[in-house]
């Protein structure tokens, strides 16, 4: 008798000839068997088998069977293939000696006392299993998963028993149809498990009862199918629903992680801001989902001992890592690269990311969010872009300073010191980038510091050259930039000791250059005033007062310069005044005799005292300069000639850099005569040799005075003639 056709939307069971080409539920094809049924039992079995298929496909939950992913489709296909391998084995197996025909026992914890039935008549009654009037498909649709599994397990156990009793020897196709029913219903249950997992995070609330039942049915299946049967039969094979549940969790996490910025692409107008917004949305979604898992989902699974928190956490971590690595492949520019690195290290990697201290990580550490080679490439690309960005920032700082020069803006005075924006801009630039890099990794911090240091070392000479070539050179600006260089040198070197080698030299060089130009401006103003020294006009004029006024005015600017550099500059001014005075005195334009010489000595002594008092009042610490002019004045006006030797000894001991030519020039002012000059020179010869040694080895640094005073080489001839 030909098999009856059916109008059910699901596929019909295949004949044994078609077993090698199993049809999956997704195909939805209908075939009519051309084989004739040998008996009424087979006809009844065919009818009931198709009814079970109709239940599995038309009455099962649409959520479970219409939303099946590619992985679920593969599950159906693998189930069917395994089924027919088992079916072929059943056809080929004959009666064997010692073959057990006992009915497999159902675990008591699963069935709760359900009896086994092995008769052929009972099989016909059980092909459409029901519990309280509901089929397995109805129970799956209503998500009574545990009840559905218990009924399905009864059917499976009964079918195994019938197979063992050789019930289907004459009708193997009936076994195939009933086994397919079991297979499809198991897969329907698995699909419903996946649907429940997908809906868990999508809905506003959590169906705790559904999750608890899901966990119980997975545990029940594991207890019912602890290991594959020895004969390799598809029936009673472990369904691995726990792995299926974990895979569903992973797919759910991947789907949700891909939602933020689904249509966003690199290169859009918003650039880094778009990426930052995408990552902010991603972080917010992951945080909310994991909080929901911890607070609502995990408690529902906890009764069955399911490690839902660890599984969800690892699933989201893996999904975020995959999404971030995809973004990393297309990231361009310093800002985008930093945003990715910063988000991975400081946002997602923060212990406060989940927003609650109770959200603990699993005992085993999570794998790196970004693979080491990807992280290294991002850091390398970031530093490459950073070099160009830092150089561009220094160019902008120079342009900003040049705009201040062009506008003739006077530097501000803050806390009593000239202040230039240069120092603050450089500090902010270096500190900002180094701090940002340090928040990501110590290695990136060190690399960024080297980049900033190298760029600053190249910038300082460029800035110095540009400023000195401008028309803005003035005492306030020079003082402001001396302060800026000094502040950069002290603060940066103290904060980043590793920068000393690269920054010390350019900053000190620039500071000295600015000091030199500051002094040169004053020297150009004072130089003409020294021409009157040791002239007859000098004896009658108050020439020193205007000179000291200029010095005092200049010192007013130095009060707004950082003290170490201000003191150095003031001492240089002090030394310049004394040196220029002595240079004019030792090369007089006019020579005094008699009373004019005495008046000149008194005038020189008064000038020495006035110079000393003025610089002492200004705060100069170069007191070693005070005796130079005074000693020359005393030699010039000494009436007791034998005491001249004592004054020379004091002069030589106080100023080790004095030389024989300077002694000759001083003696020429006094006009002592050739014999006495020879005597004094011989007496001071040993002192001069000792002074020369001290000047070369032990003289304090910076105490140079007479060495820079040039006297005429013909002075010795003049003295000899006298």
Curated annotation (Swiss-Prot):
| Database matches in InterPro entries | EXOC3/Sec6, EXOC3/Sec6_C
| GO CC annotation terms, alphabetical | exocyst
User: Which residue intervals are annotated with compositional bias (Polar residues) in the record?
Assistant: 113-122
Q: What is this protein called?
A: Exocyst complex component 3-like protein 4
> Pfam families of this UniProt entry?
Sec6 (PF06046)
Task: Give the Phosphoserine positions (modified residues).
Answer: 52, 513
Q: Which Gene3D superfamilies match?
A: Exocyst complex component Sec6, C-terminal domain (1.10.357.70)
Q: Which GO terms describe its biological process?
A: exocyst localization; exocytosis
Which residue stretches does the UniProt record annotate as biased composition, category Basic and acidic residues? Answer: 34-46
Q: Does the keyword Phosphoprotein apply?
A: yes
Which keywords accompany this UniProt record?
A: Phosphoprotein
Gene name, please? EXOC3L4
Which species expresses this protein natively?
Answer: Homo sapiens (Human)
In its UniProt record, a GO molecular function of this protein is: SNARE binding
Question: Where are the annotated segments for Disordered?
Answer: 1-53, 92-131
> What family is it from?
Belongs to the SEC6 family.
- PANTHER family the record matches: EXOCYST COMPLEX COMPONENT 3-LIKE PROTEIN 4, EXOCYST COMPLEX COMPONENT SEC6-RELATED
Signal peptide limits: none
């Amino acid at each position: 008798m030909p098999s009856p056709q059916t109008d059910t939307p699901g596929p019909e069971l295949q004949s044994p000839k078609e077993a090698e080409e199993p049809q999956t539920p997704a195909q939805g094809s209908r075939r009519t068997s051309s084989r004739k049924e040998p008996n009424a039992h087979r006809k009844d079995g065919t009818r009931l088998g198709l009814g079970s298929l109709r239940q599995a496909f038309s009455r099962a939950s649409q959520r479970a069977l219409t939303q099946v992913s590619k992985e679920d489709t593969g599950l159906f296909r693998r189930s069917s293939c395994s089924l027919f391998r088992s079916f072929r084995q059943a056809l080929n197996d004959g009666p064997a000696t010692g073959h057990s025909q006992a009915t497999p026992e159902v675990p008591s914890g699963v069935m709760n006392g359900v009896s086994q039935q092995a008769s052929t008549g009972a099989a016909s009654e059980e092909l459409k299993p029901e519990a309280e009037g509901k089929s397995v498909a109805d129970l799956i649709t209503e998500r009574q998963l545990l009840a559905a599994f218990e009924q399905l397990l009864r059917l499976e156990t009964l079918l195994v028993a019938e197979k063992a009793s050789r019930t289907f020897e004459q009708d193997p196709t009936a076994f195939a149809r009933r086994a397919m029913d079991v297979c499809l219903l198991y897969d329907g249950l698995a699909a419903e498990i996946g649907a429940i997992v997908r809906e868990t995070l999508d809905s506003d609330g959590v169906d705790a009862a559904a999750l608890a039942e899901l966990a119980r049915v997975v545990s029940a299946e594991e207890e019912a199918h602890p290991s594959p049967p020895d004969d390799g039969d598809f029936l009673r094979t472990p369904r691995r629903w726990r792995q299926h549940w974990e895979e569903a969790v992973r797919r759910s996490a991947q789907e949700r992680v891909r939602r933020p910025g689904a249509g966003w692409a690199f290169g859009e107008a918003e650039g880094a801001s778009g990426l930052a917004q995408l990552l902010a949305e991603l972080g917010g979604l992951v945080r909310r989902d994991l909080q929901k898992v911890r607070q609502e989902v995990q408690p529902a699974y906890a009764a069955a001992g399911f490690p839902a928190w660890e599984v969800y956490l690892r699933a989201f971590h893996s999904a975020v890592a995959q999404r971030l690595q995809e973004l990393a492949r297309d990231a361009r520019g310093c800002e985008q690269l930093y945003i990715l690195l910063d988000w991975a290290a400081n946002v997602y990697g923060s212990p406060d990311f989940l927003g609650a201290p109770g959200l603990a990580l699993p005992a085993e550490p999570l794998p790196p969010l970004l693979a080491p080679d990807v992280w290294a490439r991002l850091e390398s690309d970031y530093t490459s872009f950073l070099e160009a960005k830092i150089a561009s920032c220094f160019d902008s700082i120079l342009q900003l300073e040049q705009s201040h020069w062009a506008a003739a803006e006077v530097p501000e005075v803050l806390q009593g010191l000239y202040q230039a924006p240069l120092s603050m801009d450089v500090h902010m630039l270096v500190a900002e980038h180094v701090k940002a890099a340090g928040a990501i990794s110590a290695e990136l911090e060190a690399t960024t510091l080297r980049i900033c240091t190298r760029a600053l070392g190249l910038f300082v000479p460029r800035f110095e050259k540009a400023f000195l070539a401008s028309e803005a050179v003035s005492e306030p600006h020079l003082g402001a930039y001396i302060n800026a260089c000094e502040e950069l040198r002290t603060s940066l070197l103290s904060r980043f000791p590793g920068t000393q080698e690269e920054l010390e030299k350019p900053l000190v060089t620039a500071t000295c250059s600015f000091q030199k130009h500051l002094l040169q401006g004053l020297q150009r103003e004072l130089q003409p005033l020294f021409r009157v020294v040791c002239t007859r006009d000098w004896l009658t004029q108050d020439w020193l007062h205007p000179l000291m006024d200029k010095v005092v005015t200049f010192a007013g600017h130095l009060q707004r310069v950082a003290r170490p550099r201000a003191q150095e500059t003031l001492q240089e001014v002090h030394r310049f005044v004394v040196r220029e005075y002595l240079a004019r005195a030792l090369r007089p334009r006019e020579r005094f005799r008699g009373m004019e010489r005495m008046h000149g000595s008194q005038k020189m002594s008064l000038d020495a005292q006035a110079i000393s008092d003025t610089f002492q009042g200004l705060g100069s610490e170069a007191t070693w300069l005070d005796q130079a002019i005074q000693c020359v004045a005393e030699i010039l006006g000494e009436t007791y000639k034998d005491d001249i030797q004592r004054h020379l000894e004091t002069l030589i001991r106080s100023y080790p850099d004095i030389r024989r030519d300077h002694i000759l020039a001083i003696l020429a002012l006094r006009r002592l005569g050739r014999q006495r000059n020879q005597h004094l020179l011989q007496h001071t010869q040993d002192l001069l040799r000792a002074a020369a040694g001290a000047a070369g080895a032990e003289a304090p640094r910076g105490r140079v005075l007479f060495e820079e005073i040039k006297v005429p080489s013909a002075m010795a001839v003049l003295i000899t003639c006298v």
